[in-house]
């Protein structure tokens, strides 16, 4: 009698393998054979679950987003809106090996989005989700009187997005990556310049 296969478990194994490999090696260094081997299965088994590398990339992106999204939702629960915003922005930094891996994954996603409509759609959705999250936090701070009534919420959110992207590029591509402390200082200075939020004391 054929062994019963738990399709959900096997699919998760493939997505976890793809996510792990892309974080380490980038998209160009990942093959269907490599993903299958990392997951402990054959390439033939993999093609039963995804039809192409682009489909695998899209699915792996959603897999990757789960933990990131959960951590950011938790940070949003901070009662102080500005500190919630600071916490969310800190989480987005390429400040440790795991987060640098996430950014390596996302940069590969950017590159692939130029050539693939499905990947491009997911990239746009991720940015839309990110913009909404930051706007929501800045609006909360504005509604609670923590920042000036003249602050343009959307413009401030977009400037924060641009800063985070720029920091990540410097970390991964400049050859002179800013330290975690420097990355956080840049966030603190942005909050002071754009929102009038005083920089927190060290520690």
Which residue ranges define each predicted feature?
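Helix-turn-helix
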Residues: 13, 17-59
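Hydrophobic alpha-helical connector segments
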Residues: 59, 73-103, 153-160, 184, ...
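Helix-loop "lid/cap" segments that line or gate small-molecule binding pockets
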Residues: 75, 90-97, 104-115, 189-194
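N-terminal intrinsically disordered/low-complexity leader segments
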Residues: 1-9, 199-203
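C-terminal peripheral helix-coil segments that are non-catalytic and often amphipathic
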Residues: 87-94, 131-132, 136-140, 163, ...
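Amphipathic alpha-helical packing segments from all-alpha helical-bundle domains
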Residues: 98-107, 117-144, 155, 185
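Short, basic, alpha-helical segments at the C-terminal edge of helix-turn-helix-like DNA-binding modules
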Residues: 62-68
């Amino acid at each position: 009698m054929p062994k019963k296969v738990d399709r959900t478990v096997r699919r998760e194994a493939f997505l976890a393998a793809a996510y792990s490999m892309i974080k380490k090696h980038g998209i160009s260094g990942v093959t269907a054979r490599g993903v299958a081997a990392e997951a402990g299965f054959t390439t033939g088994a993999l093609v039963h679950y995804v039809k192409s590398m682009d489909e695998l990339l899209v699915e792996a992106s959603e897999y990757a987003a789960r933990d990131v999204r959960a951590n950011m939702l938790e940070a949003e629960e901070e009662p102080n809106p500005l500190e919630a915003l600071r916490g969310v922005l800190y989480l987005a930094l390429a400040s440790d090996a795991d987060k640098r891996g996430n950014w390596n994954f996302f940069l590969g996603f950017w590159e692939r989005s130029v050539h693939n409509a499905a990947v491009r759609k997911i990239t746009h959705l991720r940015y839309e989700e990110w913009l909404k999250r930051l706007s929501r936090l800045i609006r909360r701070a504005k509604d609670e009187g923590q920042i000036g009534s003249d602050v343009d919420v959307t413009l401030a959110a977009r400037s924060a997005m641009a800063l985070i992207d720029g920091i990540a590029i410097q970390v991964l591509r400049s050859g002179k990556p800013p330290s975690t402390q420097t990355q956080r200082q840049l966030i603190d200075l942005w909050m002071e310049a754009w929102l009038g939020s005083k920089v927190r004391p060290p520690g």
